[in-house]
């Protein structure tokens, strides 16, 4: 009887060991199944800086395009106003009817302000290109925000003062006994109005530049 029990125990021992090895193999396969999610999380964490840099590069390209638009509008406003004059075909022995932009101090300030804004915007183009090449750099973008804010204030002030003169030229002022001159100097008034509109367009471009650069700085 003892020999039979020893034979049965010896025969069942390999079966138990095989079951244990199978269970261990299943455990290893379960651990192996958990490894791909860890690898996926590592890939996602590495991809986030690339997505962030791509977004900033797109913002930098938009900044460059808006900067070109602001240069065109400000330079156009300065050129139109700086070449604006009209001489009426009739004159008397002592008087000639002539209207020119430098007869008004506000128009002089307008030409200087828009010309300076166009010049500084041209000088800022290399910094905008640096932001495209290095989208994560915060120093050049912070400098552009400061310059754009100053230029926006300058252009808005110049456009507002010139708009007041253009309004008086079109409508006059009964209280001050100022007559409207745009009925006689039609071309001069049209040129002045077009320059003022271009200057306000430049100020809108500059405002968009400030917003775009501020958003890019906030995401750094």
Curated annotation (Swiss-Prot):
One of its GO terms (cellular component) is Casparian strip. Residues 82-108, 163-194 are extracellular. Residues 1-39 are annotated as: Disordered. It is a multi-pass membrane protein. One of its GO terms (molecular function) is protein homodimerization activity. It is found in: Cell membrane. Keywords: Cell membrane, Cell wall biogenesis/degradation, Glycoprotein, Membrane, Transmembrane, Transmembrane helix. The keyword Transmembrane applies. Glycans are attached at residue 171. InterPro entries: CASP/CASPL, CASP_dom, CASPL. The keyword Transmembrane applies. GO terms for biological process: cell wall modification; cell-cell junction assembly. Its main location: membrane. The chain crosses the membrane at residues 61-81, 109-129, 142-162, 195-215. It comes from the Eukaryota. Residues 1-60, 130-141, 216-220 are cytoplasmic. Regulates membrane-cell wall junctions and localized cell wall deposition. Required for establishment of the Casparian strip membrane domain (CSD) and the subsequent formation of Casparian strips, a cell wall modification of the root endodermis that determines an apoplastic barrier between the intraorganismal apoplasm and the extraorganismal apoplasm and prevents lateral diffusion. Homodimer and heterodimers. Belongs to the Casparian strip membrane proteins (CASP) family. NCBIfam families: A_tha_TIGR01569. This is Casparian strip membrane protein 4.
């Amino acid at each position: 009887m003892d020999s039979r029990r020893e034979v049965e125990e010896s025969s069942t021992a390999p079966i138990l060991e095989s079951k244990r090895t199978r269970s261990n193999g299943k455990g290893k396969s379960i651990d192996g199944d958990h490894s791909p999610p860890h690898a996926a999380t590592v890939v996602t964490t590495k991809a986030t800086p690339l997505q962030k840099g791509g977004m900033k590069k797109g913002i930098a390209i938009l900044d460059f395009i808006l900067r070109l638009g602001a240069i065109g509008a400000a330079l156009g406003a300065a050129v139109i106003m700086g070449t604006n004059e009209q001489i009426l075909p009739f004159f008397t022995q002592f008087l000639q009817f002539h209207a020119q932009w430098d007869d008004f101090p506000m128009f002089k300030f307008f030409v200087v302000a828009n010309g300076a804004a166009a010049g500084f915007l041209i000088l800022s183009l290399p910094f905008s290109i640096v932001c495209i090449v290095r989208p994560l750099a915060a120093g050049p973008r912070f400098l552009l925000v400061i310059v754009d804010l100053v230029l926006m204030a300058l252009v808005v002030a110049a456009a507002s003062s010139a708009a007041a003169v253009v309004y008086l030229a079109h409508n006059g002022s009964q209280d001050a006994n100022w007559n409207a001159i745009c009925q006689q100097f039609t071309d001069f008034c049209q040129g002045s109005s077009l320059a003022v509109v271009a200057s306000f367009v430049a100020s809108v471009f500059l405002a968009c530049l400030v917003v775009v650069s501020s958003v890019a700085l906030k995401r750094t």
